[in-house]
Design a protein with these regions (language model features):
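Extracellular beta-strand-rich recognition modules
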Residues: 17-23, 68-71, 80-89, 102
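Single-stranded nucleic acid-binding surfaces, predominantly the OB-fold ssDNA-binding core
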Residues: 25, 37, 46-50, 100
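Extracellular/lumenal carbohydrate-interaction signature centered on repeated Trp-anchored short motifs
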Residues: 1-19, 62-63
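Extracellular carbohydrate recognition and processing domains
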Residues: 44-81, 92
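Solvent-exposed strand-loop boundary residues in beta-sheet-rich modules
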Residues: 27, 41-45, 108
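Extracellular carbohydrate recognition
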Residues: 29-31, 64-65, 76, 88-108
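Beta-strand acidic-aromatic groove motif in beta-rich domains, primarily in extracellular
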Residues: 19, 28-40
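Short, surface-exposed loop/turn segments at beta-strand-coil junctions that are enriched for proline
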Residues: 2-9, 26-27, 73-78, 89-92
Length: 109
């Protein structure tokens, strides 16, 4: 995601982010999903990475479901781009890692 349109605000160092998603899986299977956020400068150098999840089977009481996970942080002042990645991990059988309503919001402080 291109952030160069708000580079002045980011440069002032008063922009934070909120990353949210409903994450989960199937039954007692330990298939799981995580969401990563990575901020890069204009040369493609990684400035900051963070993320939310995963939600393991034990976190779901070995039932099928999705649960809200949230993360907040500061956007590095020289950020030009941000990438959001969903990683699904398979424990066995089919991959039943779930994600819904993934959201990244940038906020002024």
């Amino acid at each position: 995601i291109d952030l160069t349109g708000i580079e002045a605000e980011i440069g002032w160092g008063n922009i934070s982010y909120s990353l949210t998603a409903f994450l989960g899986g199937y039954s007692s299977q330990n298939d799981r999903m995580e969401v990563l956020v990575e901020f890069f400068d204009s040369s493609g150098n990684l400035l900051l990475s963070g993320g939310i999840g995963p939600v393991h089977a034990a976190d779901r009481n070995n039932t099928t479901g999705i649960f809200l996970r949230e993360g907040i942080g500061e956007v590095p002042p020289s950020s030009a781009y941000v990438r959001v990645t969903l990683n699904a991990y398979l424990s066995y059988g089919y991959n039943d890692a779930y994600a819904d309503n993934v959201s990244l919001i940038l906020l002024t402080q």
